[in-house]
């Protein structure tokens, strides 16, 4: 029965997004919610100016509806389910505010870095206080072993870092048509397998709901994209994947399963440090996906390559936890 529920959850969330998109995209166009493309980006991206953004609203709606329907009917609406939805919606609303300022108020930078960080920290802190009341453990599991390290208060700092850092890392990856939708589907698919293996079926249902939602979105977001998810989608997905890693106690594995997000973030950090210390850039442009565009790769080639790398990372993560 539960196997059927997982399949139903993917199908339902996929269909919700696919059915909503043809209705919602023209609505975004009428409101003139078009994406602004930064001038310092690859020149090939200038033609994307005006493409409807804030499509992450459809992803969020699909995830929430599917998760609530499926967990209420076939599993339990646990504290973990509510925490997952809280963080996903919370970071989604923060992203929506950022998108709204960029698109509607015509302030290209959106929220300032400080404003965004304060919002991310507030959501992370609320998550911590609710989570710790449910009797959470401060032990950090070592993947592939029966060992764990009790971090004490250090775990609280790790938890907050994961939520803030995870949302930003995933946000950085959302720079090419279909790139984030595909890599997110792979990462959440891997965590669905691991949550199922632990018997945490409510978390597994949430994960497959995300998979279905982003795959449905990919139908319209693949190159050439008809809609972008915006920060509404990318921040929500980043917060969600970090929360899943925390609730399954597979925090370290996020570095592997979310390897593409980690690499993208490291490319930005390396680029900034190199330029500030030596005046030279390591990459043509960061995040890394733009570097490959500027050395001559087509956008589709970059995206498919990153999907493949993400799939390898996901399989490695599952192998380490399940079979070692």
From Swiss-Prot:
Its EC number(s): 2.7.8.13
UniProt record, GO biological process: cell division; cell wall organization; peptidoglycan biosynthetic process; regulation of cell shape
Main location: membrane
Alphabetic keyword roster: Cell cycle, Cell division, Cell membrane, Cell shape, Cell wall biogenesis/degradation, Magnesium, Membrane, Metal-binding, Peptidoglycan synthesis, Transferase, Transmembrane, Transmembrane helix
InterPro entries per the UniProt record, alphabetical: Glycosyl_transferase_4 (IPR000715), PNAcMuramoyl-5peptid_Trfase (IPR003524), PNAcMuramoyl-5peptid_Trfase_CS (IPR018480)
Membrane association type: Multi-pass membrane protein
Reaction equation(s) it catalyzes: UDP-N-acetyl-alpha-D-muramoyl-L-alanyl-gamma-D-glutamyl-meso-2,6-diaminopimeloyl-D-alanyl-D-alanine + di-trans,octa-cis-undecaprenyl phosphate = di-trans,octa-cis-undecaprenyl diphospho-N-acetyl-alpha-D-muramoyl-L-alanyl-D-glutamyl-meso-2,6-diaminopimeloyl-D-alanyl-D-alanine + UMP
Membrane-spanning intervals of the chain: 5-25, 50-70, 77-97, 117-137, 147-167, 176-196, 203-223, 227-247, 250-270, 304-324
GO cellular component: plasma membrane
This protein's pathway: Cell wall biogenesis; peptidoglycan biosynthesis
Intracellular or extracellular location(s): Cell membrane
Cofactor: Mg(2+)
Enzyme class label: transferase
GO molecular function terms listed in the Swiss-Prot or TrEMBL record: metal ion binding; phospho-N-acetylmuramoyl-pentapeptide-transferase activity; UDP-N-acetylmuramoyl-L-alanyl-D-glutamyl-meso-2,6-diaminopimelyl-D-alanyl-D-alanine:undecaprenyl-phosphate transferase activity
Domain of life per record: Bacteria
Reported function: Catalyzes the initial step of the lipid cycle reactions in the biosynthesis of the cell wall peptidoglycan: transfers peptidoglycan precursor phospho-MurNAc-pentapeptide from UDP-MurNAc-pentapeptide onto the lipid carrier undecaprenyl phosphate, yielding undecaprenyl-pyrophosphoryl-MurNAc-pentapeptide, known as lipid I.
HAMAP family: MraY
PANTHER family: PHOSPHO-N-ACETYLMURAMOYL-PENTAPEPTIDE-TRANSFERASE, PHOSPHO-N-ACETYLMURAMOYL-PENTAPEPTIDE-TRANSFERASE HOMOLOG
Family listed: Belongs to the glycosyltransferase 4 family. MraY subfamily.
Name of the protein described by the UniProt record: Phospho-N-acetylmuramoyl-pentapeptide-transferase
Gene from which the chain derives: mraY
């Amino acid at each position: 029965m539960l196997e059927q529920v997982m399949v139903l959850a993917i199908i339902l969330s996929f269909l919700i997004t696919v059915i909503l998109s043809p209705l919602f995209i023209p609505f975004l166009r009428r409101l003139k919610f078009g994406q602004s493309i930064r001038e310092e980006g690859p020149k090939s991206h200038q033609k994307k100016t005006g493409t409807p953004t804030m499509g992450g609203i459809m992803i969020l709606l699909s995830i929430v509806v599917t998760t609530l329907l499926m967990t209420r009917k076939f599993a339990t609406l646990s504290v973990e389910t509510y925490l997952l939805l809280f963080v996903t919606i919370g970071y989604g609303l923060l992203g929506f505010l950022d998108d709204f300022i960029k698109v509607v108020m015509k302030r290209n930078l959106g929220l300032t870095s400080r404003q965004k960080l304060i919002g991310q920290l507030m959501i992370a802190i609320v998550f911590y206080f609710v989570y710790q009341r449910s009797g959470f453990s401060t032990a950090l599991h070592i993947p592939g072993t029966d060992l764990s390290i009790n971090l004490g208060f250090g775990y609280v700092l790790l938890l907050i870092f994961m939520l803030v850092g995870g949302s930003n890392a995933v946000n950085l990856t959302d720079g090419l048509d279909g790139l984030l939708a595909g890599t997110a589907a792979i990462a959440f698919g891997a965590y669905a397998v691991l949550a199922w293996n632990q018997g945490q079926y409510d978390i597994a249902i949430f994960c497959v709901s995300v998979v279905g939602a982003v795959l449905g979105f990919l139908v319209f977001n693949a190159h050439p994209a008809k809609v972008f998810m915006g920060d509404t989608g990318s921040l929500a997905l980043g917060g969600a994947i970090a929360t899943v890693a925390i609730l399954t106690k597979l925090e370290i594995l996020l570095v592997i399963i979310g390897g593409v997000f980690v690499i993208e973030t490291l490319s930005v950090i390396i680029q900034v440090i190199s330029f500030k210390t030596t005046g030279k850039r390591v990459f043509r442009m960061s995040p890394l996906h733009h570097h490959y565009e500027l050395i001559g790769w087509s956008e589709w080639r970059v995206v498919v390559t990153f999907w493949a790398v993400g799939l390898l990372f996901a399989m490695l993560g599952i192998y380490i936890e399940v079979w070692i």
